Amino acid sequence: MPGKLVGSSEEAARTGTQANAHAEDHSDLEHSAPSTDDGFDEPKPPIAKSVPPSTAIPKKNNFKQRGNTKNVKPPTLEEMKELRDTQNLFHSNLFKLQVKEMLEELQLKQKYTDFIENWLESFTVFTRQLKDGLMERTHLEVPMKLSEKPTGFVFSKPTREPYLIGAAATGTLLGPKIVVDVALEMPKESLHKEDYLNLRYDQKRALYLTYVTERMMESPDYAQDQFNFNYYANNPLKPVLELIPVTKQVNKHLQVRLFITAPLSSFKPGRFVPWNNNIRPSFYGDEWDEQDPLPSTQHYNANVLFDLTLSENQAQLDKAFKSRRNFQDGLLLLKVWLRQRQLDIGYSGFGAHILAAFIVYLNKQRILHQSSSSYQVARTVWNQLANTDWTKGISLAVDPIQTEELNKFAEHYDVCFIDFTGQHNLCANIPLYLYKRVREEAKLAVELLNDMKLNSFPLIFMQKCPLYSRVDNILKISNYSCINQMLTLHSQPRIKYDFANYGYPQLLHLLTELLKKGLAERVHSILPLETATAAWPVENKAPVIGKYIQLGLILQPEHAYEVLNKGPAANDDLAGAEEFRRFWGEKSNLRRFQDGSITEAVVWGTAQDSPAKKRLIVRHVVLHLLEHHLQLDSKEVQYIGGELDQVYKLSPWFKVNKLKTKLSLDQDTDAEALSPHVIRCYDELARQLHGLNDLPLEIVSISGVSPIFRYCEPQPVLPQALLVENRILASTIQRVVIQLGQSGKWPTELGALRALKTAFLIEIGEKLEAQCRLHWVISADGLLVLKQGYCFLIELAHNKELALLKQEVTERGITTYVDNAASRFLERQHYILPKVSGALHSLHQTYSAFGSTVLLAKRWLATQLLDDGLWPDMATELLVAHLFQQRYAPQSIAAPQTGFIRFLQLLSHSDFNGELFLLNFNNSWQEQQIADLEHNYRSNRQSYPPLAVATSYDMQHAGRLWTSDQSPSQRVLGHVTRLARRALEIIETSLMSKDLRFVRPAQLFRASNEGYDLVIQFKPDLVPNSLSYDLGSPFVSFSQPNFSLPRAGSDYIARIVGLLRSAYSDFAAFFYNPHGGKELAIVWRPTTEFAAKPFKVTELQACRPCGNGKVQVLKETLLEDFKLLLKDFYLRIATPEELKREQREHQKPMRYFEANQAVEESKPKPKKHRKRKGTGKEAPPKKKRLIKSSTLKALK
């Protein structure tokens, strides 16, 4: 179960070691006793009394520093050696302790070791009691599709005792579910000399397994056990028995897999060399020209050789690993690393047995030594994996293989690693792209180890990195008839024979070759995404597998979104141009380019297309290739890439053609595509500000600090701001900070200085109106400027204001300067945020997926009813920036959807209590500064907020500037972690299932309506809708959207919710969607907060007397307070259950309009007006219109 290795990394990290790689089931593991051969050179117990290891380093320091050393013993030789090894091999003593503790926890409990030994002895006795005989009818199903009925099979008693293979033999079993592999060898007499042909060996192997299984089920020793068949490594030619012993000793945490093998001498030497054919075309009813050579079946041959060479290979591995704790522990480290990346799953998986053989290979090459520590073993393997090329072939053969023969071997496989016998390729089924991926992951591991600024242990061993989270796009084909059609019409006969007509590797080869040629430089890797085959009861028929395929594409950001595929010139290369037209079909056209060349070309879009459209180019290419070459309709294919981009698209309810603007806007535009328009408008405004004449002081710097200037605004910003009656109406404002030249004439009193700032802003507004014809309005927050339909808020920053905010006068009259909440806020907004905003803008220029990943992350958090007061927007931006800055994967993120999945992983698996998220922009932090900050963080953790984020521009506020104790609080942080884990489960289930389609945005971007006590509905006409795509409310059905423009900068709902939190956070928690949400969800605090308490003058809020000198908080009183604060915005209060009942009964919740109508109906009807005399006509009826409240009028 590779996907469940790490179940509770947070708990392990709290211990300071992050070493519990099997927290899902602690009962499998135990702490082993210290060993002198564990690769860390543990201090051996000397004859004299030794100094404890934990005090070795401090005593060494004391020995140097103190003059009185009479009672202090110097370190022992063992302790000195251990310290020297720590300094030479590891980043720090912490890393060494983390590795050491993880290895100790990976060791099996003695009860499992005893059980395995006893079970093997019992099974050996059972096999001795088996009798030779004819296999007649069986109530079990043979776990293989046979060409004919199993009649006449003669069972021969095994002549060799069963033996352990794999991890059980080398002492490297890994939990949480322990899988013990046992091999049972068929005797040579069971096979005939012609059994190498046409799957006869494989059929006999399956029959032999069935016979042994049936006898085991009849034996009283195994009567209570659970029997299942399964395919080893998703290979239908490799059925194995999976037996789960039912005993209290192992408690169903152990599984035994029985492999049937055969001796190497069963067939003539050289019968299964890669260039031989062992499956005849006639076996599948095909005709073959006798004059043509038969195609080689190298992959089928390797499949048989796996069984034939297993005994010899295992003997050599046992010899290499026996009593070598360092090799065993090194292999355990590598297995953890491999399993966390899910590179060992399925038919094409890079199995741990390959790494075990590679350790022996490096030992033979004298790259690894007997005395190498476990850490050195793992590091050396990663380093050699990254820097050696197996495509040319490497060999473990006892008898050296000539270079010519090795090259001949390598020609038949993508990857070649010859085993000890010199006949079997251990990497026969590994495709080239997957091997390259393993090399890249190994290279990344070495780079992480070499980064002295980083604690690489959790990144290498603790974090789950499923393969689907490493790819940018995913291609799924699961239609059974389409798969059969492709295999029948397009799979080459030689490939069919090579893989014994197994569909999966044929599909993998067919699609990989086609996409590799069609995508070319657009794609970096094409990786198979496999899931392990599920076991089935032995009484059931073997399932048909291989009729489904899923590929992951890792894109090259530099070339993936190019709109043109340019072919050869028609005049210079006629054959090449013809081949280009044949490959691309009707998409190819002859085009003339600006340089005068005339070539064949395929155009997939225009240079002016939005980033979201360009990200779909690879999708269009893939679907065209499948349709043109494989006749596969796009409806039969599921291509996953960009589905979640919908959440930051413009709402279809808002019609852009009604806007009065010179900009060319599409109805299907989105927030990402609209950002450059605002940035260009801001750049022009900045030039106009710099060009203003006759200002008292020169403007020296202008900085845009709103999220849109760093491509992080999830709501589409349109040029719709208006000037109405000297008031600017705008849905959003863009903040701009300006700084002036130095002057000594500024007041030294805070109020006077702010008044002078306001006067200066007014003068700037007047100059903008006179010289640039721009409308402006002064507000309490700054100068509002209207330009091209966008509203900008200009703020003036001055150092003296910050100093005055910090200024305090002591009782003795001494003036001091002390940081406070107001000064920190001002410093962040005016001086630090401009620098961080510029750094994030630069990050987006480097990684184009950064901004859109932030958009997805912000929209997800907002739809989970988490506003800026509960989870700061800047925290989201900085966490995503942390993802792009850190080397979590060999390739940078090219697709926003992938970035969003990794953001969810960061929220799910991070240890927020022990991790400080550092963003070293421009490498402006020195190593020592980082070390000092991390040390201060660890030693004073309680002084930092629950989520600590620091940038290199934060100065003395590092770690405390962007978040606080309440935003997010510990509870909110835990809530977000649980939400992220659930979202990941939904995504992974939909991605890896062959039956389910990819998750719809509404499944992820809509909050649950469970867990809330009350819901306060707002009047929909007083709360404008967001311009972003509305995915619906978790509480009520869709309502008519309201896109009215409020007064610029007046977010009334946010202010009211802030007031509610500041006044009533001790009694309730408040949640709402800041992107146009029209409901406020409330969760009451525990009942203890509402219990009667003694009377205190300072604690009387919302209380009433309840006798005996006590007071009590009443929820009814609180609700009345809430209504009073919400004033005209409040519509009604209901419980989620009441809202659900209304939905089930198809009753619409009472809307504001209906409420008004009910009120009107309850009033006495007015008297009818009589007709005027002298006129024969009635007065025309007045049009019905909505009478807006005074609050709405105040918005204008």
Swiss-Prot record:
This is Nucleolar protein 6. Residues 22-31 have a biased composition (Basic and acidic residues). Part of the small subunit (SSU) processome, composed of more than 70 proteins and the RNA chaperone small nucleolar RNA (snoRNA) U3. One of its GO terms (cellular component) is CURI complex. It is found in: Nucleus, Nucleolus; Chromosome. Residues 1165-1174 have a biased composition (Basic residues). Keywords: Chromosome, Nucleus, RNA-binding. Residues 1-75, 1140-1196 are annotated as: Disordered. The gene is Mat89Ba. One of its GO terms (molecular function) is RNA binding.
